[in-house]
């Protein structure tokens, strides 16, 4: 009988199974790590441990992986399934020599030398009983629970106290065939493999647990005694005519107001509550791109998460997902408005640090905050902040606030050694709890101050919220970004280290725009967002069920055959399944009559549904604009369509943070897809297949309100070419209100003053707001915008502009 089948081992495994709850990272190793099920597989573990191997054996069957107790049989030879780098640590004395374990590596390499067709996948496996990072001061708790190499007695205590928080992490496989072919099969290579594996396990532990935590007061005193803060305190005392002791006390107050007080114990408790909450709220949380972020952590990058901001849920969702993906929840920059009892202290213990909405003119506060942020970066804590500054009330990305990005870039300029990488994150929901509140705020109602009662009010409304979506976008490594934008930045900073570079502000603006673009590049298309996109483009927000399903199939075809980026995710299924999901979530309603089913958006939530449409409108705006060209111009040519898109794309790019690299190519691909789908034919120009015209009209409707805004702006500029930016914003907003009242436009963003402000900035950048000979361009774009509108809407705009500016 084998050792693991003995009564003693079976009893231990039974007891451990009762005490242990294991979380696997990543959740689907075969899929996420590209493991080949047809190739033999062996596990590499850091330390020989009965409990670790038992925990691994409990999950391998469910994952379709071989049991660690099952020997590796290759060509009649048998080898251990698990290779350990070092033996178990005895209660007393030294660990046994690692020669036995080196021999295990050598035996596997030897088999490859004898069998050229063989390729064993060597999969590193890390186990973590709890994820306590430890404190900078050694404590009894650390002595009992936080050691990397516990004795069997300490391991028993760890299982007893932390067994419900056991994580098993699989890493990308190493091909032993590649190692044997490239480096040979002798003892030297086995030793090298062991060294590389040790470094890997050490880095992996840091990714999973994070750096050790400082004592809060010790951190404060270290910061307050830094040269930068000493100087700021002296300046504060001189400028405010107070003593240095008073200025120092004020700096300590600021630190206490700002700083997080991370508690691993609270995070473990919060994990249980959030697991219950997500299971109550959502049917599932869809994640894309986590493996790339894990790799950046593993490679030693300082990670800064920059998510979009839809809801207060964002704080919880991203931290929860990162925890379950084997990464440490970040320190989160939260608005000081969230520092109310009891949420504030809990957020602070969960890693939140608080920032005032504005601290312009308060030099001491600015210096304290910057030094604290620098300390987080230096010590290796991941950080999260929202570049939009607040939650989007319309579902579109807001114009970025650049303060935190500027501080981050400054940290790099001041000599940050480790690579600093921004990770854009798209957060999406089938239901955002605050949507109704957003609509009231956009209608002029004053925003309520956050309080504990709002939290309880939100908890009362918990229900079926469908799915959540977390997509990690393309990372931006700041050292690489600086090298691309300003190749000689290091030399310039070295010459004048105290001087703020003139190029820093425009570079921060470029970086902010790139962050927002990368967030939108990682958008998640769901049944709710796509269904709202279709129905809100229809006349009465209603369609026959068969027509809606057909239209959804067309959009899915566009999104899957012509993916926006590799970071974008698209819901699985077809039009029928998407409609069914929308009905189950009560986002759309079904009415039946003898002629068939009608699907519609209830009038009471039609405005709220624009929020979900706006989450993904940028993905479909160019196909919609192409459809608009086809429906409004008979026999239009391919080149004419491309020219029209070229005129409007810079405005779309500024408004929707789009990053299409080659619009000409994309337009050509869209037209080819329309031909393949039997929507149009192409001879001298394009002709619409009469029976399919409704599909193109519906698609064109998505960009309709955007074109109306552009028509308002360019009609004003054509009549008043010398109009100032502020006047253009005011007049555009006034005409938009009139147009909305006459034609029933209810989308909140149509009346958003900030949107017209952002467009006017882009118009100035493009040269349309100056006397430099761009009048011809203005006239051309006005004609093109007018030509893509319904005649009634066009006439309203032209007449209103003429009446307002007769002189």
Curated annotation (Swiss-Prot):
Keyword Lipid biosynthesis: yes
Matching InterPro entries: GPAT/DHAPAT, GPAT/DHAPAT_C, GPAT/DHAPAT_LPLAT, GPAT_PlsB, Plipid/glycerol_acylTrfase
Short motif (HXXXXD motif): ranges: 308-313
GO molecular function: glycerol-3-phosphate O-acyltransferase activity
UniProt keyword annotations, A-Z: Acyltransferase, Cell inner membrane, Cell membrane, Lipid biosynthesis, Lipid metabolism, Membrane, Phospholipid biosynthesis, Phospholipid metabolism, Transferase
Pathway(s) of this molecule: Phospholipid metabolism; CDP-diacylglycerol biosynthesis; CDP-diacylglycerol from sn-glycerol 3-phosphate: step 1/3
Known EC number: 2.3.1.15
Gene Ontology biological process terms in this record: CDP-diacylglycerol biosynthetic process; fatty acid metabolic process
Membrane topology listed for this record: Peripheral membrane protein
Recorded GO CC terms: plasma membrane
NCBIfam families for the chain: plsB, PRK04974.1
This protein's name: Glycerol-3-phosphate acyltransferase
Annotated source species: Shewanella sediminis (strain HAW-EB3)
């Amino acid at each position: 009988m084998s050792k693991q089948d003995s009564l003693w081992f079976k009893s231990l495994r039974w007891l451990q199974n009762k005490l242990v709850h294991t979380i696997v990272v990543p959740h689907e190793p075969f899929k996420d790590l590209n493991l080949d099920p047809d190739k033999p597989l062996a596990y590499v573990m850091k330390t020989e441990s009965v409990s670790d191997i038992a925990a691994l054996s409990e999950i391998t069957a469910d994952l379709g992986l071989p049991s660690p107790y099952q020997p590796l049989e290759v060509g009649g030879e048998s080898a251990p399934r698990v290779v350990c780098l070092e033996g178990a640590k005895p209660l007393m004395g030294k660990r046994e020599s690692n020669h036995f374990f080196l021999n295990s590596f050598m035996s596997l390499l030897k088999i490859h030398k004898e069998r050229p067709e063989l390729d064993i996948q060597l999969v590193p496996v890390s186990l973590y009983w709890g994820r306590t990072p430890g404190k900078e001061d050694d404590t009894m708790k650390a002595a009992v629970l936080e050691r990397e190499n516990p004795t069997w007695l300490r391991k028993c205590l760890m299982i007893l106290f932390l067994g419900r928080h056991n994580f098993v992490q699989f890493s990308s496989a190493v091909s032993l065939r590649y190692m044997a072919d490239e480096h040979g099969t002798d003892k030297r290579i086995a030793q090298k493999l062991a060294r590389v594996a040790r470094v890997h396990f050490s880095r992996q532990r840091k990714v999973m647990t994070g750096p050790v935590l400082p004592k809060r007061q010790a951190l404060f005193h270290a910061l307050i005694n830094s040269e930068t803060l000493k100087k700021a305190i002296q300046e504060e005392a001189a400028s405010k005519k107070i003593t240095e002791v008073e200025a120092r006390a004020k700096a300590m107050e600021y630190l206490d107001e700002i700083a997080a007080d991370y508690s691993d114990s609270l995070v473990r408790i919060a994990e249980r509550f959030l697991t219950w909450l997500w299971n109550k709220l959502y049917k599932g949380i869809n994640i894309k791109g986590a493996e790339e972020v894990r790799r950046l952590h593993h490679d030693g990058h300082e990670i800064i998460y920059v998510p979009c901001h839809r809801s207060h849920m964002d704080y919880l969702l991203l931290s929860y997902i990162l925890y379950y993906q084997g990464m440490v929840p970040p320190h989160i920059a939260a608005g000081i408005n969230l520092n109310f009892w009891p949420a504030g202290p809990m957020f602070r213990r969960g890693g939140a640090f608080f920032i005032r909405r504005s601290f312009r003119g308060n030099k001491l506060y600015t210096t304290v905050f910057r030094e604290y942020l620098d300390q987080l970066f230096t010590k290796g804590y991941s950080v999260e902040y929202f570049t939009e500054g607040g939650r989007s009330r319309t579902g579109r990305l807001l114009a970025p606030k650049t303060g935190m990005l500027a501080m981050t870039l400054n940290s790099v300029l001041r000599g940050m050694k480790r690579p600093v990488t921004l990770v854009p994150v798209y957060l999406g929901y089938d239901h955002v709890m605050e949507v109704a509140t957003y609509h009231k705020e956009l209608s002029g109602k004053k925003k309520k101050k956050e309080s504990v009662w709002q939290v309880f009010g939100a908890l009362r409304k918990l229900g079926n919220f469908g799915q959540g979506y977390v997509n990690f976008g393309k990372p931006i490594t700041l050292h690489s970004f600086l090298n691309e934008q300003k190749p000689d930045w290091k030399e310039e900073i070295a010459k004048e280290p105290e001087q703020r570079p003139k190029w820093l502000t425009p570079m921060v603006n470029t970086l902010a725009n790139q962050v927002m673009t990368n967030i939108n590049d990682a958008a998640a298309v769901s049944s709710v967002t796509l269904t709202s996109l279709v129905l809100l483009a229809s006349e009465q927000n209603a369609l026959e069920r068969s027509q809606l399903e057909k239209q959804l199939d067309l959009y899915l075809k566009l999104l899957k055959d012509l993916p926006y980026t590799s970071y974008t995710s698209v819901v699985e299924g077809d039009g029928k399944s998407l409609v069914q999901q929308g009905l189950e979530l009560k986002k759309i309603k079904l009415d039946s009559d003898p002629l068939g089913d009608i699907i519609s958006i209830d009038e009471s939530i039609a405005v709220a549904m624009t929020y979900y449409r706006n989450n993904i409108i940028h993905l479909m705006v160019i196909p919609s604009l192409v459809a608009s060209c086809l429906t409004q111009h008979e026999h239009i040519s391919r080149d004419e369509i491309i020219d029209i898109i070229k005129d409007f794309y810079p405005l779309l790019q500024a408004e929707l943070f789009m990053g299409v690299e080659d619009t000409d190519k994309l337009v050509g691909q869209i037209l080819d897809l329309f031909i393949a789908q039997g929507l149009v034919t192409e001879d001298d120009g394009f002709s619409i297949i009469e029976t399919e015209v409704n599909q193109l009209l519906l698609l064109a409707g998505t960009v309709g309100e955007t074109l109306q805004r552009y028509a308002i702006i360019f009609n004003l500029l054509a009549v008043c070419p010398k109009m100032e930016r502020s006047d253009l914003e005011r007049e555009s907003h006034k005409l938009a209100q009139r147009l909305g009242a006459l034609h029933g436009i209810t989308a909140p963003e149509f009346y958003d003053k900030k949107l017209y402000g952002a467009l006017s900035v882009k118009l100035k950048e493009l040269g349309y707001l100056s006397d430099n000979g761009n009048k011809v361009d203005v006239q051309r774009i006005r004609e093109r915008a007018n030509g893509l509108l319904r005649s009634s809407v066009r006439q309203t705009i032209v007449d209103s502009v003429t009446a307002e500016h007769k002189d």
